[in-house]
Amino acid sequence: MLTFNSFNLAILISNFFWPLVRILAFFSTAPIFNDQNVNKKVKIILSFLIAFLIKPFLPKVNVELFSIIGLFLLFQQILIGIALGLTCQFLFAAFTLSGEIIALQIGLSFANFFNSNRYIGTSLISRWLNILNLLFFLTLNVHLYLVFMLIDSFYKIPVDVNFLSANIFFIFLKFSSNIFLNGVMFALPIMIFFLISTLIMSILNRLSPQISIFSIGFPLNLLIGILILYYLMSMSFPFFKSLVNQLISFIFYTFLKI
């Protein structure tokens, strides 16, 4: 005869609840999904749907939800979801850094937009690069890759496996430094040009005091900076694809094998 008691019910609920927590934590930090314009009800319904579909294929965890081990697993699922989402945010952070550097060099750092997601002001160039980044993100279906990686994480890092280790922080630090290095490299042509331009204008100003840096240098820097930025646009899509490949390689071959 089939017996079903409160312990079995608690195990059944917990096996659905822990994947749901990881998915919700991921959607709260991952790009596109954490946007203020995405309805919270849509994110919750999508999380419940994914958790319901993958639950029959996940290994059973015989741990009660309201126990010390259960609370530890709950904290661990939140940590894994947030870590996956924040790792994906590096794609947009690299372009944001490039835009801030370019805007500072051109002289457009004073032109700011309010970012409703981060509650801070971002420069005009950063906003423009982020819009391009968003278009590339959707064109390449990266959001679907992220959902696939999230589902795959339940097989590579099961719910009852200890995820916490001393190497996690250093692994993320190394990867984030590599992503931000790429962001600086994207803005490097403009940085080098304006370094040379400032040096030349300084020498000309010393040789001929009639040449004013403020009346000639700033408009010239703005004009040439926009022309170089137009040239960089042809490189932005290959640059984004390179970042996506680095992100996918890191998640599949490093993060999910910790």
UniProtKB/Swiss-Prot annotation:
Keywords: Bacterial flagellum, Cell membrane, Membrane, Transmembrane, Transmembrane helix. It holds the Pfam family Bac_export_1. One of its GO terms (cellular component) is bacterial-type flagellum basal body. The keyword Coiled coil does not apply. GO terms for biological process: bacterial-type flagellum assembly; protein targeting. It comes from the Bacteria. It is found in: Cell membrane; Bacterial flagellum basal body. The keyword Cell membrane applies. The chain crosses the membrane at residues 7-29, 44-58, 65-87, 91-113, 129-151, 182-204, 211-233. It is a multi-pass membrane protein. Its main location: membrane. Role in flagellar biosynthesis. Belongs to the FliR/MopE/SpaR family. This is Flagellar biosynthetic protein FliR.
